[in-house]
Curated annotation (Swiss-Prot):
<dbReference type="InterPro" id="IPR005794">
    <property type="entry name" value="Fmt"/>
</dbReference>
<dbReference type="InterPro" id="IPR037022">
    <property type="entry name" value="Formyl_trans_C_sf"/>
</dbReference>
<protein>
    <recommendedName>
        <fullName>Methionyl-tRNA formyltransferase</fullName>
        <ecNumber>2.1.2.9</ecNumber>
    </recommendedName>
</protein>
<dbReference type="InterPro" id="IPR044135">
    <property type="entry name" value="Met-tRNA-FMT_C"/>
</dbReference>
<comment type="function">
    <text>Attaches a formyl group to the free amino group of methionyl-tRNA(fMet). The formyl group appears to play a dual role in the initiator identity of N-formylmethionyl-tRNA by promoting its recognition by IF2 and preventing the misappropriation of this tRNA by the elongation apparatus.</text>
</comment>
<keyword id="KW-0648">Protein biosynthesis</keyword>
<dbReference type="InterPro" id="IPR036477">
    <property type="entry name" value="Formyl_transf_N_sf"/>
</dbReference>
<dbReference type="Pfam" id="PF00551">
    <property type="entry name" value="Formyl_trans_N"/>
</dbReference>
<dbReference type="GO" id="GO:0004479">
    <property type="term" value="F:methionyl-tRNA formyltransferase activity"/>
</dbReference>
<keyword id="KW-0808">Transferase</keyword>
<dbReference type="InterPro" id="IPR002376">
    <property type="entry name" value="Formyl_transf_N"/>
</dbReference>
<dbReference type="InterPro" id="IPR005793">
    <property type="entry name" value="Formyl_trans_C"/>
</dbReference>
<feature type="binding site">
    <location>
        <begin position="113"/>
        <end position="116"/>
    </location>
    <ligand>
        <name>(6S)-5,6,7,8-tetrahydrofolate</name>
    </ligand>
</feature>
<dbReference type="Pfam" id="PF02911">
    <property type="entry name" value="Formyl_trans_C"/>
</dbReference>
<comment type="similarity">
    <text>Belongs to the Fmt family.</text>
</comment>
<dbReference type="InterPro" id="IPR011034">
    <property type="entry name" value="Formyl_transferase-like_C_sf"/>
</dbReference>
<dbReference type="InterPro" id="IPR041711">
    <property type="entry name" value="Met-tRNA-FMT_N"/>
</dbReference>
Length: 319
């Protein structure tokens, strides 16, 4: 394998840690790890290590946590490591051109989409949200643009009808880890050649927001179902009733019937152990798993046992 390559790894969340673990499991030479500074987390707001820092510390790998890489002083540690390549996976900091030029073979990035589709911050979730039938992983040679570099390795992966943001991320992390190792092997052998991206096919995966997670009954049920799946585990789709935010963790789109054509979107059609059914502009959304503020996730049946009066047949929910 590519044991001869000296690697700097840059990443922060669980998705990144999966890739680092795979490299370590295959005895890759990791000179150092760059990750985001420790952040307050949890109810106590105590400083917490990133998943990548936790893993690196367990393996006694030097950890660097600059707030930016814009100054020469901050870049010196990369230069001092004298790496062959820098592997970047969901790091969260911009890499200036000076940094991109430092490793002998430059910097490569693992991006969980089929570039140039879904460049940007939330490619996994946007693929589900848009109703894509497939996605994948692209490993690219980094340049100064946003996910615009030449593609080194690309693998297609089907999106299942029940995939969520969480489940698809786990699948693509496993796929990306394998592809990364293959890419490094080919780079070490001098057999890797890049392919330019087709700018005409570019789409952008903008950051997710809590505002867009609110369910709008004026949209089709099929789209709302995709939102529920895409926004799991964050920011989580929700609706508001009696001034309370109710998160929806699971829902299915269903066809409506002729008998409801006179009703307005947002109308409660049915509420039982199988779910709470709400009419939309096109079809019915059957919601089956919920979470009240500060509470655990519960089934529709448990929700109705405590809040049945909220979902009387014919009641109108606000968008």
């Amino acid at each position: 394998m590519s044991e001869s390559l000296k690697i700097i790894f840059a990443g922060t969340p669980d998705f990144s840690a999966c890739h680092l673990q795979h490299l370590l499991s295959h005895r890759q030479k990791i000179l150092g790890v760059f990750t985001q500074p420790d952040r307050p987390a949890g109810r106590g707001k105590k400083l917490a290590f990133s998943p990548v820092k936790i893993l690196a510390t367990q393996h006694h790998i030097p950890v660097y946590q600059p707030h930016s890489l814009g100054l020469k002083e901050e870049q010196q540690s990369i230069l001092d490591l004298d790496a062959d390549v820098m592997v970047v996976v969901a790091y969260g900091l911009l890499l200036p051109q000076a940094v991109l030029n430092m490793p002998r073979l430059g910097c490569i990035n693992v991006h969980p989409s089929l570039l140039p589709r879904w460049r940007g911050a939330a490619p996994i979730q946007r693929a589900i949200w848009a109703g894509d039938q497939e996605t994948g992983v692209t490993i690219m040679q980094m340049d100064s643009g946003l996910d615009t570099g030449n593609m080194l390795y690309k693998t297609v992966y089907p999106i299942q009808p029940d995939d969520t943001g969480a489940s698809l991320q786990a699948k693509l992390a496993a796929l990306g880890s394998q592809d990364l190792l293959l890419t490094l092997k080919k780079m070490a052998e001098g057999k890797m050649h890049g392919e330019t991206q087709d700018e005409q096919k570019t789409t952008y995966a903008h950051k997710l927001t809590k505002k867009e997670a609110r369910l709008d009954w004026l949209l089709p049920a099929a789209h709302l179902e995709r939102c529920v799946r895409a926004f799991n585990p964050w920011p989580v789709s929700y609706f508001i009733i009696n001034e309370q935010i109710i998160k929806v963790w699971e829902a299915q789109a269903m066809p409506d019937s002729q008998q409801v054509s006179h009703l307005q979107p947002g109308t409660v059609l049915k509420a039982d152990k199988n779910g709470i059914q709400i009419l939309t502009s096109e079809g019915v959304l059957n919601m089956t798993k919920f979470q009240l503020p500060g509470k655990k996730i519960i089934s529709a049946w448990d929700f109705l046992n405590s809040r049945n009066e909220w979902f009387q047949i014919g009641k109108q929910l606000l968008s």
